[in-house]
Amino acid sequence: MEESIKLLVGCYEQVLFGYRVHREGEQWLSSADFTHHAHTASVSVLAVNNRFVATGSRDETIQIYDMKKKVEHGALLHHNGTITCLEFYGNTHLLSGAEDGLICVWNTKKWECQQTFKAHKGQVLSLSIHPSGKLALSVGTDKTLRTWNLVEGRSAFIKNIKKNAHIVHWSPSGEKYVVVIHDTVDVYQLETAAVVGTINNPKRISSAQFITDALIAVAGDEEVIRLYDTASQKCVCEFKAHENRVKNLHVIELQGTHVVVSSSSDGYIKMWRIDMEKVQTSPSLLCEVSTSARLTCLSAWLPSGVDHKEKSNTAVTASAVKDCDRPKKKKAQNETTDKEASETQVVHKKRKPETKQKKKKPS
């Protein structure tokens, strides 16, 4: 069976690019699949599941595309401000965050906004859904890390941090998560909700993606990608990936092979094969694509759904969610209980957003 994926990138020029990458023998070949003038302002963020691609923009809209039918599915209008983060949970839900401080939970069957959280006093900068779909994390410009109980649709916990974090990610198993502040990556353990180690990168971090629970890829404001051991926090490999600074990373798994996809200010997208038995050696370049555009965001779509299959519900039980919510007997200065957090939460159940249904094929 021929291996084939779609590399998707957004850019300052308001365009969504799609490139087909497929394997022929030992070679990976790329070809332009589509270009689409997606927004009226620069594309800021991308998210995919095995059916749809969602794009967010500075024009304050979320555009939905059906990758199987190759048609524009519609627009979601709810936020007031640049869309800063998008993430699908399987085929059922999409979470969006924006400069207006809101996190919206969308049902992907009817594309209704089921819930709206007043998530942060400032902008929402990053969000991440636990593999179980029961918890989510978010960071914003109010110097807080917030935990959301998606089972009951409410705030679970608020942790004050010293500086604004701009990236948060769960590990593949959901047992760890990372919070990125400027040039540092704090590694947290879910069980204790405490920092178990800190990775120090030489440059400000633009992207960080788990390859496995034990290995994370980090890109900063430079041409280099580094792989760090999350247990020892040591750099196990670094290599020059691009001619200009690396903007985005995305990790996929193809038939047991871990692949890091990178995009850069030089307009190139590259695919790197990680040899998990020889992590210290530089990854091999599988293919590269020149877009001649100023790239802003990156993702990959797998027609087979290998990378976007429904996530396991075994990682976090209902009791674990309750344990996360339970206030501590003694509250530290930098922590806030759910009771205090609930005062800032706004929930609008089953509110229908304005939608624009289109059947316009991309050129």
Curated annotation (Swiss-Prot):
One of its GO terms (cellular component) is nucleolus. Pfam families: WD40. Residues 322-342 have a biased composition (Basic and acidic residues). GO terms for molecular function: protein kinase inhibitor activity. WD repeats lie at residues 38-75, 78-116, 119-158, 200-238, 241-282. One of its GO terms (biological process) is negative regulation of signal transduction. InterPro entries: PAK1-Kinase_Regulator, WD40/YVTN_repeat-like_dom_sf, WD40_repeat_CS, WD40_repeat_dom_sf, WD40_rpt. Residues 309-363 are annotated as: Disordered. Keywords: Nucleus, Repeat, Ribosome biogenesis, Signal transduction inhibitor, WD repeat. Coiled coil: none annotated. Residues 347-363 have a biased composition (Basic residues). It is found in: Nucleus, Nucleolus. SMART domains: WD40. PROSITE patterns: WD_REPEATS_1 (PS00678), WD_REPEATS_2 (PS50082), WD_REPEATS_REGION (PS50294). Negatively regulates the PAK1 kinase. PAK1 is a member of the PAK kinase family, which has been shown to play a positive role in the regulation of signaling pathways involving MAPK8 and RELA. PAK1 exists as an inactive homodimer, which is activated by binding of small GTPases such as CDC42 to an N-terminal regulatory domain. PAK1IP1 also binds to the N-terminus of PAK1, and inhibits the specific activation of PAK1 by CDC42. May be involved in ribosomal large subunit assembly. PANTHER family: P21-ACTIVATED PROTEIN KINASE-INTERACTING PROTEIN 1, PAK1 INTERACTING PROTEIN 1. This is p21-activated protein kinase-interacting protein 1-like. It comes from Xenopus laevis (African clawed frog). The gene is pak1ip1.
